[in-house]
Amino acid sequence: MKKIMILLSAVLFCLAPAAAATADSLALKDITGGSYSPGYVYGVTPMADGESYSRLSDDRKRIVRHSFKTGKEIGTVFDVEKAKGVKLKGFDGYVLSPDENRILIQTQTKAIYRRSFTAVYYIYDVRTGKLEPLSDGGPQQVPLFSPDGNQVAFVRGGNLFLVKLLYGNAESQVTKDGKFNEIINGIPDWVNEEEFSTNRSFDFNADGTMLAWVRYDESQVPIYDMQEFKGLSPERMEYDEYPGSYRYKYPVAGARNATVSVLTFDIKNRVTRTMKVPMDSDSYVPRIKFTDNADKLAIVTLNRLQNQMDIYIGNPRSTECTLAVRETAKKYIGESAYGSLKFFGNNFAYLSDRDGFRHLYLYNLSGQLVKQVTRGSYDVTDFYGRDPKTGAFYYASRQESPLRKAVYCTDKNGREKKLSTETGTNSAIFSQGLRYFMNVYSSAALPPVTTLRSAADGKLLTTLVDNAALKQRIEPLLAQHEFFTFTTSEGVQLNGWMVKPRDFDPAKRYPVIMYQYSGPGSQEVTDSWNLGFFGGALYESYMAGKGYIYVIVDGRGTGGRGAEFEQCTYLQLGDKESKDQVETALYLGKLPYVDKERIAIWGWSFGGFNTLMSMSEGRPAFRAGVAVAAP
């Protein structure tokens, strides 16, 4: 990526006169190398006691427990140097059993796609201190404990396996038809993983007597050949002189997808059944999840056009399924609907934009709407959970502004309380039991600040990371930046962000670089430290130091402004998005300090696609453009 950024900068430098580097300027190698990266608290796992969280130590040798109230280290959950049996030098991650008496220790991790990976797992018994292999059959994927912690299911080679920890880690194979590029059990194929943001498609029921999973038959999906080079895969010495090829099933838009079905396995009787899910042959199953009732399996289906989502409640033994909720949309149903789905007792809740904005709805398992939890002309972005004792719901929303996000709770009577106190962008990780939360706050002017707070009233308990030193270091180096809005010739108001040189002179005319992503539901213009390509306005300030004005505008199709604004691009991607970027360039060209003859546009992925669409829109608004990794 560094080489690409240097090439991009070189291409765009033709638009502006050279500017001399100074001792107090940003260096591109420092930006791309992470020298200005803010500090975070990574890998937080809330613990069962509701009072603490665990995380992997920086040296990757321990699992450390911290207090949710003080943030202080209060114990060690696992230490490679003290474990009996297998000896490890370190590890990559871990999974706690629900009762926290056992831990899966993740080692030798190898990435597959964006979210999928294989790893060699070891099982650690907290009570005995013994560490031993989970399986001797090879690396595993997405291992999952049963609710009682006595079993582990995982995927290997497209098949599901089960390990019974009370029987000497006895391993059995649940499925046998898994085959690369043909049949996959329990984990999604590439397109389902990528588009539905998941890497696991199986679950245990509440009493650990049943397994359910999605089976993907991709035998009829077209094959795509992707070249592999030694430069990106140094271990592949055979590609030193000539590239190799990775062949996998990749359905382009409109092509045949994998055919999906939902199966169950009776662990005691070893009987496999196929659920009778009423769905079309080209439908998706983005989620399955057992409820708190061991005999009730929730199956979420989505039609090919993604404008109808059905939630079925099925019996894993009789295989009969009953429709609980049918969600329909004029355009499409976003990932937040099935991605936010949570079950608790005899109820479930999820996010829907059926009234024009994304809000939280509560149902019972029979499919009856209990109530609409939130309402208003704003989007709820995250659903954190419901307190079983008080009935309070915890969530984040853009109630204050499409550019900002805050954390809230609503009690059982509908009274809302704001828990985050800072204006900007807030994200939370709640303790089990929802007594505390870790809040990460940032703004366009402030690097992330991580704090611990009370979930009752948002009271600050302690600050874990404030990035004050980083702020002090880079504040003198950042260029002027400001938010703005303008209205297009079609009457659409768009939000934007502009970075000007530190020595900006309104009497001069400056060349402009426009960056955009523009993908459905995305947001680049937010009051957060994530602003810009590398965050913190760093790259944009660097380019401003070279004599450019840098502009980012979120056009139609982006998120945070309700369903109509976000979904108006349905089935016509690249049309309205490109028009809005051209409108941005035309608007900028009318500003007295902009040289309208020197406006460039660029973007990455969907942003690369929209760069090409914008430059070929018909109105000659751009002098240059760079499309990186355009689909």
Which role fits each region the language model picked out?
Residues F68-G71, D125-G129, L165-G168, D266-R270, ...:
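Short loop/turn segments that connect beta-strands within beta-propeller blades
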Residues R60-R65, Y113-V120, G157-V163, Q220-M226, ...:
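Structural motif
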Residues S37-L56, A83-I103, Y121, G137-V155, ...:
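Conserved beta-propeller blade repeats
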Residues G34, G71-K72, Q108-Y113, F117-V120, ...:
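Predominantly five- to eight-bladed beta-propeller fold
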Residues E73-V80, E132-S135, A170-K179, R273-K276, ...:
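Beta-propeller fold detector
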Residues T22-G39, I267-K276:
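A short helix->beta-strand "capping" segment at the edge of beta-propeller domains
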Residues R55-K82:
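Beta-propeller domains
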Residues A294, N426-P631:
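Serine-hydrolase catalytic core recognition
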